[in-house]
Amino acid sequence: MRTLKSTPEKDGFRMPAEFERHSGCWMLWPERPDNWRLGAKPAQAAFIAVAAAIAGGEAVSVGVSAAQYYNARACLPRNVRVVEISSNDAWMRDCGPTFVIDGNGRRRGVDWTFNAWGGLNGGLYFPWDRDDQVAQKVLELEGADRYRAPLVMEGGAIHVDGQGTCLTTEECLLNPNRNPHLTREQVEEQLRRYLSVTKVIWLDKGVYLDETGGHIDELACFTSPGHVALTWTDDRSDPQFEISQDAYQRLRHAKDARGRSLEVHRLHQPEPLFMTAVEAAGIEAHPGSHPRRAGDRLAASYVNFYIANKRVVMPLYEKRRDAAAMRTLKRLFPTREVIGVPTREVLLGGGNIHCITQQIPRPQGA
């Protein structure tokens, strides 16, 4: 692995859409007791179910600490690769690399600067030094050259269509706890350089009470060129109502990089979900970590799914809303099997399926 001084844009590399072909998927293993209840055992079961669902259509690798290596190897399916990688938590989407490809069969990776969603100004834990090393270690294992981007950002803050368009939110990427020295125009320029996009569509806020600070992957994502899935609610009393309405209007009036209008598909969120007293009691309190309390509203969204080669793996919350969301996703992905996985235990930790996965795209001609 080489660390390159150029940029993907300059070298002819781009970030492909998640719905393009993959070579595989990376995840991390949960274990910290101040974020995952009951010593992370319930969360580990959910991660295992997600890994198994994805492994039915593409290779899956899971990074695990030395202390948890034998436990993870014993629990995960045999067709899932287990690799020792130190990390501070288990959010591969955010601390892992963003892979980019060119038209000559080559793949490289972008290593963003990670500060645990805000550093000492609203971040979720300290320290985060091992997380900031994860992307480089994954790229080393994948034999992919590395671009170290001068931008504090997480993979969940962006969604691309693979044809020059990027979705993000002002709440996240313009937050002073990420890049206070950069203007909106300068942030856009960095996205152009490292993703090879030519159009950035800015939505205002992410999902209500998303503790990452407004990640796009809870709110909206591309399902195919010109098509966007959007978290939705018809409940005017829910703060999410105005957020989704504003996002809908921005998307409906936007053009993508190729000049197309966007078709927006509403994915109704589940009824508001809250952390129970029993769940909160199972989480240890540690200094420097985001507290989790009974009654906290959980940022539940059906948009936080993973698009695999042959499958879409979606979170399950409650039967009625689950069924409606699955019907919508089957319509949006007619050539893929839609598989639901119960992931409340992941949600309790602050994210969901998309947050714990990172696709490895297959370069053209490979």
Give the positions of each predicted feature.
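Histidine/cysteine-enriched polar flanking segments
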Residues: 1-366
